[in-house]
A protein has these predicted regions:
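PAS-family sensory domains
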Residues: 1-7, 158
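A short pre-motif secondary-structure segment
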Residues: 92-95
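Conserved nucleotide-binding and Mg2+-coordinating catalytic segments in signaling enzymes
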Residues: 16-38, 55-69, 77
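Short helix/loop segment flanking the catalytic signature motif in cyclic-nucleotide metabolism enzymes
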Residues: 75, 102-119
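Catalytic-core segments of nucleotide cyclases and related cyclic-nucleotide turnover enzymes
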Residues: 11, 65, 114-121, 125, ...
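PAS-associated C-terminal cap
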Residues: 6-20
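Short regulatory alpha-helical coupling segments
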Residues: 19-20, 33-49, 80-88
């Protein structure tokens, strides 16, 4: 008989590291789109209330163009840190794309999620004084899990639509404020 014994510790550690890298955003270390879609799909199978908060950072392109990508990275990580202070371990938070993020609040009714997002928006915009405005827009959609008809992509699409409505309203308000400032300066 011939026995071969091999230590696979390094291989297992490497596999684990690669798995983590495949599911994490390199800059923020939160989940990435792949991780999010997988977790959201699993959560939708459960019979619980889920509130999807689809967030889009405002002004990121401007910050990158005016102040450089290092400052843009700071802006993103400051946003992530602000969100993380307000979510629970059972909630899911991921970076979906460059300036787009999604939080799934587990068993958190729409009204409570809306209050939470407003609080986060206020904290984010007022924290860490910078030469530029800090804000994000957020679309919120509440769903009941356990419904096999629900698809993550459809929920994201609806939350994204809600987010753009808020962004559009915010821009109108911002333009009105600028108009008032311009008129009063004349």
């Amino acid at each position: 008989f011939l026995y071969i014994i091999r230590d696979v510790t390094k291989e297992k550690l490497r596999e684990e590291r690669l798995r983590m890298e495949a599911n994490r955003d390199g800059l923020t270390q939160i989940g990435n789109r792949h991780y999010f879609l997988e977790k959201a799909g699993d959560m939708l199978k459960e019979e619980s209330s889920l509130t999807f908060c689809y967030c889009d950072l405002d002004h990121l392109k401007y910050i990158n163009d005016q102040y450089g990508h290092t400052e843009g990275d700071w802006y993103i990580t400051f946003f992530v840190e602000t969100i993380q202070k307000h979510i629970r371990k059972e909630d899911v938070f991921a970076r979906i794309g460059g300036d787009e993020f999604c939080v799934i609040l587990y068993n958190c009714p729409y009204e409570m999620a809306e209050r939470k997002i407003r609080k986060i928006q206020k904290e984010f915009s007022s924290g860490q004084t910078k030469e530029y405005p800090k804000s994000f827009s957020c679309g919120i959609v509440e769903v009941e899990g356990g419904n096999e008809e629900l698809q993550v992509r459809d929920i994201i699409k609806q939350a994204d639509h809600e987010m753009y409505l808020q962004k559009k309203e915010h821009k109108k308000k911002y333009r009105k404020e600028l108009s008032v400032i311009s008129i009063s300066e004349d």
